[in-house]
């Protein structure tokens, strides 16, 4: 459908019987109205042509071959001189065969049938609106229960006795037998109601606004009562309040979308276009048919049987009619959703029938596989790898992908700069990989964001925008902090890249979809850009090292171990003095020169800390020097004092990994502080 803003959209919901009839019926040029499928047949076994008024009827759904009717006559499509526009003998219009992809039909149900999605799926919409237990409604739908129909103001037999399901056992079993007696059909139809028709009557009598008002009043009353002291009663009250909220929201949704509650009970069953449920002939003359065709046939068979019972045989017992209505309800349930909360129906080979719900849902369903999974222009796909040097809002695009995505922009740049006379010359320069091509490509990419998407896109953070840069290789580089939003990891995951073309799309990508602007989860507000997986392992390796402090020295022979955690004996042990560094730059420089390892312990000069100088910790060792100064050695720091006990400097015991980690955090905080100062 197309909305008022001329946007194509798809809406799934309940529709009225009049709307179903408008979709499925059509008037052929002779004035005849067609659209109802009345026969459960598909193709004639001799002529191999669709049966009239069957599931593949050409009068209802259109010709199989464009411009050729069922009789074999041919007319030119669109030729106004050709008259008439349909075959007078078979009634088939001379139109294109593509009409069989969207022309629907319908089955006129003899008895109303509840839509299984609204009845059995949780939460049950019908049960919520009627405020009745689901088990009771299911018993009513499948003709296990009956209730009195209060259509007359005068007291009637059943209105005096009430509903069957609430009566004593003698009434429960004797009254149905009384009404099934021959000659009581009119009396039975007036007094009792059962099946989906009973549900439809109750839904039609609902006033949604009164439901909202009454539910709100009851919710307020339950809130004013307060806790009762009984845990079971309190939980019951909470569940009731939650139910009232759901009921009010459901009623508001029906009012907002102009949907009537009784539309959840079907009187007309739509029949899908035949091209969406095909019958294909394979080798050997065998036919392969969609399971939906068999399920439609089952519905038509049972519906026609019920029609015959009601029209031809007036002496049919009521119990037999109710049983046939139950079979029609079960057949429609199987067609719409086979096996919902029960045992699925199987064919002769013990294979489960694939219902309409199975066709449209899941990864291999009609929406995700056929409609949403289409390839589009200006898009690419590749494996993602970690880009540790990237900024949060950047991603690395391989040259091969980037030149294909931005080829039209590069061609325009070459022509504007008079480096190519036409499109053909520009394409040849791109194929030859001339240096000027990559320069123009980088200029184009600087002002153009790209969108990265990882399927399945379950929430809005599944697709985000990034500023692309060129990288070597054939993989997309991604900052590891954005992986949680995509639910991605670097074990072979693939991501799609798209180029926003219009100015509106580019503005949306820059203002709303950039990765550095989506740091919090839209669902619960927790940070979404947090270290995970590879980053956590890297941080652990970076900050790992000896945690025993100064105790692991030459005075403790039990701690003499190498980097492989192997014990070193007295004869082979050589004590390595831990180096001292005045600043972090010297320590990192020594690591780059391979004089020390990443996790080698060292002493780093640190700023004086009042908490250290005021600490009452007892030093492990004290080293005195000839000039009177001495070193107080603690577990994780060292203090140099004068002869007058004045503190000269402090050294902390750390590793190069800890220093690098600290510097990264310090630079990030300084950058954040500068950004805040610029904003103020």
Swiss-Prot record:
GO terms for cellular component: chloroplast; DNA-directed RNA polymerase complex; mitochondrion. DNA-dependent RNA polymerase catalyzes the transcription of DNA into RNA using the four ribonucleoside triphosphates as substrates. Zn(2+) binds at residues 69, 71, 87, 90. Pfam families: RNA_pol_Rpb1_1, RNA_pol_Rpb1_2. Its EC number is 2.7.7.6. It comes from the Eukaryota. One of its GO terms (molecular function) is magnesium ion binding. One of its GO terms (biological process) is DNA-templated transcription. It is an enzyme of class 2 (transferase). Keywords: Chloroplast, DNA-directed RNA polymerase, Magnesium, Metal-binding, Nucleotidyltransferase, Plastid, Transcription, Transferase, Zinc. This is DNA-directed RNA polymerase subunit beta'. Coiled coil: none annotated. Gene3D superfamilies: 1.10.40.90, 2.40.40.20, RNA polymerase II, clamp domain, RNA polymerase Rpb1, domain 3. In plastids the minimal PEP RNA polymerase catalytic core is composed of four subunits: alpha, beta, beta', and beta''. When a (nuclear-encoded) sigma factor is associated with the core the holoenzyme is formed, which can initiate transcription. Binds 1 Mg(2+) ion per subunit. PANTHER family: DNA-DIRECTED RNA POLYMERASE, DNA-DIRECTED RNA POLYMERASE SUBUNIT BETA. Belongs to the RNA polymerase beta' chain family. RpoC1 subfamily. Its cofactor is Mg(2+); Zn(2+). Mg(2+) binds at residues 489, 491, 493. It is found in: Plastid, Chloroplast. It catalyses: RNA(n) + a ribonucleoside 5'-triphosphate = RNA(n+1) + diphosphate. The gene is rpoC1.
